[in-house]
Amino acid sequence: MATADRDLTFYTHSLCPYAHRVSLCLAEKAIPHKREHIDLSNKPRWYLDLNRRGLVPAIQLDGEVKTESLELNYFLDDVFDGAARLTPDGRKEEMQTVIDSFDGSFISAGLQFVGGGWGFRRGAPGPRQVDRMAEECEKIERIIEINGNGGPYLMGSEVTLADLALWPFAERYELAMREFQGVELREMGPTGSLSRWIDAMRSRPSVVGLRPDDNKLLASWRRTMRLDYFDYETADVDNP
């Protein structure tokens, strides 16, 4: 396990959900690091030289650059001591299977529900989009009941990397679905486990500290009608 004196730089965009995953991991584990905000609408040359694809998140540890949000969180939890261990003892493969089960499908279902791709539509989505999102919410509830033994978190009574992988997207979809479709994400889970999970996550200091201002975020979404508008114009958590 690494000690706190290693040179860690985190390259992020404060509104990117993938980078948000790593921000949560760093906060939960209280890992000291330097944070560099990257303007994705105008990527600096030095960053492209460092990270050829120019994407976030990325970290540089002792001169070595690593990318991909899930892989970064696995790496950070394995390598760094911290305030928390985010992989349950003896259940790493089970946790990875849980993450794999929702990583693509929940993200895709949510994007289609709020507008198809990364854009927004106003008004009700079609029956296919509703059914698909409902299936994903029911899947999350089954994970909580089976893998989490009732929760409140996905893997049980303690937060894990699985929760940090799902939360940035759930948080954005909850706000977008309420604003643009008049639908409450938490009500799409029939047993109430999804709602309790949302409440448990919202109570965590890391989540509270990294949450953007809803009113500012909604204003930016209404202006651009895109979840990923920050890829095209300068924005950050303080001025979305």
Regions found by a protein language model. Give the residues of each.
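GST-like domain detector, emphasizing the conserved glutathione-binding G-site
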Residues: M1-L154, D228-Y229, E233-P240
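Alpha-helical scaffold segments in carbohydrate-active enzymes
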Residues: R21, T97, S101, K139, ...
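Short amphipathic alpha-helical segments embedded in low-complexity Lys/Glu-rich regions
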Residues: K43, V183, N215-A219
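Short alpha-helical "patches" and their helix-cap loops
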Residues: D89-G90, A124-D131, R178-R196
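Substrate-binding/catalytic groove segments of enzymes
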Residues: G151, E174-F180, V207-L210
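GST superfamily/GST-like fold recognition
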Residues: G156-Q181, E187-S193
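A contiguous, mid-protein "functional segment" used to position or interact
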Residues: M188-A219
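Long, positively charged, glycine-interspersed low-complexity recognition regions
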Residues: V207, D214-P240
